[in-house]
């Protein structure tokens, strides 16, 4: 029997079992011009390549990209200083400015002073539209319990002006670095709350996702765990991790990505950067705001105490809890 991949809730392909070989073939087809009959058949089966009107920013030689600030103004200040020291020409944020941490309003002036170019994550979409929940994409009751506590706190501590500003942010950006075009999204090009984990994102699927969205690299966040994969086609996928909380590895640093033009027009240099910051000051502020002690423990220990149920088996096996 052919290897099968299950993809649920896919806007393009629907919920079904798809032979792995079909993904490889579709990825190859999406990357080149097709005769009309074959193009029609591929479009019927997989959907047309995405015609994206998003303007392309740049070109840049080097950019810094973060995701999931989660109200961590200490880490954001550290990022802006570190990115400038490393020669980044622009700083991008892939959304989720609030949540988890204290005093989300402290993030806004730092973003503006630092010229950070942000997009909407699920938090921005929900806060700007007055949604009742964060639309995080969790299915487990415990995950949803802590997500609700986090969202309610953030909702109460964001001014109407901040929420309205969130609603003006684009949902995606396209950026040229060297000779490569990058697509910046929150969860995935398909859904703001899709989790792209390293262990459950097969190469053929990523190839097809990049080909259909006509980009050389996809940069995303949402999972809170950083990873980078160079695909056989030369395309790349980078999950930049989270700036707002540790990566569930027992380290108190947080993570962001530096993306630079490499040697040759078609090359990228990607560096996933661990970033120290004053995590003890953040923990003290969280306690002063009476945020859940489980959140504080994560900041101080580097290990997640919540949002564990969403993790795939390999990522969960690396957890302490």
Q: What are these model-predicted stretches?
A:
Residues 66-67, 91-96, 100, 117-122, ...:
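Active-site neighborhood of phospho(di)ester-bond hydrolases with catalytic His/Asp-centered motifs
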Residues 75, 97-114, 127-139, 195, ...:
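Metal-dependent catalytic neighborhoods of phosphoester/phosphodiester hydrolases
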Residues 113-174, 196, 200-217:
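Active-site neighborhood of divalent metal-dependent phosphoester bond hydrolases
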Residues 203-231, 235-243:
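Anionic-ligand binding region
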């Amino acid at each position: 029997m052919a290897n099968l991949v299950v993809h649920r809730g896919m806007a393009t392909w629907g919920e079904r079992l798809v032979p792995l070989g079909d993904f490889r073939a579709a990825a190859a087809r999406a990357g080149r011009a097709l005769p009309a009959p074959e193009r029609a058949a591929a479009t019927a089966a997989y959907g047309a390549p995405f015609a994206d009107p998003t303007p392309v920013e740049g070109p840049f030689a080097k950019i810094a990209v973060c995701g999931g600030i989660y109200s961590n103004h200490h880490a954001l200040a550290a990022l802006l200083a570190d990115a400038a020291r490393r020669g980044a020409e622009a700083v991008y944020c892939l959304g989720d400015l609030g949540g988890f941490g204290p005093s989300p309003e402290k993030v806004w002036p730092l973003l503006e002073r630092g010229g950070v170019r942000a997009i909407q994550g699920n938090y921005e979409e929900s806060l700007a539209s007055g949604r009742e929940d964060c639309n995080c994409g969790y299915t487990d009751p415990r995950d949803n319990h802590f997500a609700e506590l986090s969202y309610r706190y953030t909702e109460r501590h964001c001014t109407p002006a901040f929420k309205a500003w969130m609603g003006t942010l684009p949902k995606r950006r396209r950026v040229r670095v060297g000779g490569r075009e990058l697509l910046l999204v929150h969860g995935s090009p398909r859904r703001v709350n899709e989790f792209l984990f390293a262990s459950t994102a097969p190469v053929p699927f990523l190839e097809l996702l990049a080909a259909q969205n006509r980009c050389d690299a996809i940069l995303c966040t949402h999972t809170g765990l950083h990873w980078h994969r160079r695909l056989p086609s030369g395309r790349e996928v980078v999950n930049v991790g989270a700036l707002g909380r540790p990566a569930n590895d027992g380290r108190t640093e947080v993570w962001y990505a530096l993306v630079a033009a490499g040697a040759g027009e078609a090359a990228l240099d990607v560096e996933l950067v661990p970033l120290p910051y004053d995590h003890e000051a953040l923990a003290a502020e969280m306690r002063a705001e009476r945020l859940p002690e489980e959140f504080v423990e994560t900041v101080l220990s580097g290990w997640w105490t919540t949002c564990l149920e969403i993790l795939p088996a390999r990522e969960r096996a690396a957890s302490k809890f």
